[in-house]
């Protein structure tokens, strides 16, 4: 139904109105989603910062811990059975691997340790040398998850030697199957070795994802697009009113 406002008439078509409402609703939903992601990233950053406030000593029986909890554990590395997670990048965008080393806990049980990033060699057939000295030591690091692929298509072949085994986004179960070990600590899927610890490589640990303000900026863009669409809808559907006695729909035929 046309609405007269002074010398102007607002007279949108039904289909145009419906389409505009749907698009604006979608844009607003995307904006809210980005704000939610910003809140989630803030919480993750706060958890990462708070993880170092207290250190937990872990063993095989330790229950699952919150992500980024700082831990310590006595034990020894198993240098002979390591995994290189492929397609990992450094902070400068260089291609390489994360070095995942099994750690035998004193008293029994195992946990995986991410000892850091190493660069890709001249070719993928040229595996990096990642041996670590044997012997007892005290492990210090943060609990975390293994890197996950954004999209995985279909089942994958099991991991097989020779070591070090190169794998793209392996799961904990896949690595456990490769090592033929069943006694795993439940504290975490992997421990990020502290930057100050020996026997590690490049370690620039931080909570993954964009900074919160990046998500806020994306939200502002979505809200701005919604506002722009609303303005276009109004402007394109307002016309000058016809003179008295003229056919008000003449300009729309």
Each language-model region and where it sits:
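Surface-exposed, charge/polar-rich loops and edge strands
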Residues: 2-62, 69-253
């Amino acid at each position: 139904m046309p609405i007269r406002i002074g010398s102007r008439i607002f007279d949108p078509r039904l289909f145009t109105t419906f389409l505009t409402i749907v698009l604006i609703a979608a844009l607003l939903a995307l904006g809210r989603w980005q704000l939610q992601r910003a809140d989630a990233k803030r919480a993750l950053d706060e958890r990462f910062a708070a993880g170092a406030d207290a250190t937990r000593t872990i063993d095989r029986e330790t229950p699952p811990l919150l992500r980024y909890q700082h831990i310590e554990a006595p034990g020894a590395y198993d240098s002979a059975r390591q995994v290189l997670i492929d397609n990992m990048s450094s902070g400068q965008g260089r291609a390489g691997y994360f070095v995942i080393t099994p750690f035998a806990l004193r008293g029994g049980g195992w946990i995986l340790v991410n000892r850091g990033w190493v660069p890709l060699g001249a070719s993928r057939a040229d595996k990096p040398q990642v041996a670590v000295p044997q012997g007892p030591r005290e492990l210090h690091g943060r609990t975390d998850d293994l890197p996950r692929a954004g999209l995985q298509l279909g089942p994958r072949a099991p991991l097989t030697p020779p070591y070090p085994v190169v794998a793209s986004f392996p799961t904990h179960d896949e690595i456990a199957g490769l090592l033929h070990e069943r006694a795993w600590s439940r504290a975490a899927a992997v421990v990020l070795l502290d930057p100050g610890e020996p026997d590690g490589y490049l370690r620039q640990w931080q909570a993954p994802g964009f900074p919160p303000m990046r998500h806020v900026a994306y939200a502002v863009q979505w809200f701005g697009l919604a506002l722009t669409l609303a303005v276009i809808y109004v402007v394109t559907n307002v016309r000058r009113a016809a003179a008295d006695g003229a056919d008000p729909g003449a300009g729309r035929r």
